């Protein structure tokens, strides 16, 4: 009985040591809420987010949104400036917007890299990753096309995937952003069944 108790105690200590030896890392998902640049892209339907469009989306509004995004992401890093190792985002127009985010003064020290693919979504809205290559060693990435058999002509955002290692351990990340409920829950349900 005494040997069993000692063995159980040692096993518990070993388990606790393994758990406490692991470094916690921050992984974040953030919906950028229609973060478009101000340039009209003839390949997508982004007219709403241009200086001439109904939202009058100009460089002043863009800079304000960029500053707000920088603040939110930096606040996640906290006082200790422990930047998230992976930030998955949705509702971003293109790589250029992501490059502006990681170049902001408060985010630049994180030395982020980008994993992004243009999706077939009509407005050009994508999902993407920003990651720290000093911690996450990227081995690969790929988009997964989202298809809805009952709506073959419906084009939506891809699912973005990336894989690699953290401290030699394999990790796989996915970020997805399903179609909205525009038109009501029942009317839009088939678009979210992918």
Language model features with spans:
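Positively charged n-region of N-terminal signal peptides that target proteins for export
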Residues: 1-4
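Generic alpha-helix detector with strongest preference for long hydrophobic helices that associate
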Residues: 6-9, 50-54, 82-83, 111, ...
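Bacterial N-terminal signal peptides
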Residues: 8-17
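N-terminal, active-site-proximal structural segment of metallo-dependent hydrolase catalytic domains
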Residues: 20-105, 115-125
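Active-site regions of metal-assisted phosphoester/phosphodiester hydrolases
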Residues: 21-51, 55, 132-194
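Active-site-adjacent helix-turn-beta-strand microarchitecture at beta-sheet edges
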Residues: 97-159
């Amino acid at each position: 009985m005494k040997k069993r108790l000692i063995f159980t105690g040692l096993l518990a200590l070993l388990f606790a040591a393994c758990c406490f030896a692991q470094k916690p890392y921050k992984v974040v998902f953030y919906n950028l809420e229609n973060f478009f640049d101000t340039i009209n892209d003839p390949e997508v339907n982004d007219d709403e987010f241009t200086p001439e469009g109904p939202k009058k989306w100009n460089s002043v509004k863009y800079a304000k949104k960029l500053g707000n995004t920088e603040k939110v992401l930096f606040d996640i890093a906290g006082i200790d400036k422990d930047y998230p190792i992976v930030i998955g985002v949705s509702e971003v127009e293109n790589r250029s917007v992501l490059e502006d985010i990681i170049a902001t003064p408060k985010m630049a020290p994180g030395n982020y890299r980008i994993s992004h693919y243009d999706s077939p979504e009509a407005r050009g809205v994508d999902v993407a990753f920003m990651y720290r290559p000093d911690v996450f060693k990227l081995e690969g990435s790929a988009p997964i096309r989202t298809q809805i058999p009952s709506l073959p002509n419906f084009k939506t955002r891809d699912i973005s995937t990336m894989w690699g290692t953290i401290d030699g351990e394999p990790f796989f990340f996915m970020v997805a952003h399903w179609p909205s409920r525009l038109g009501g829950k029942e009317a839009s349900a088939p678009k979210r069944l992918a």
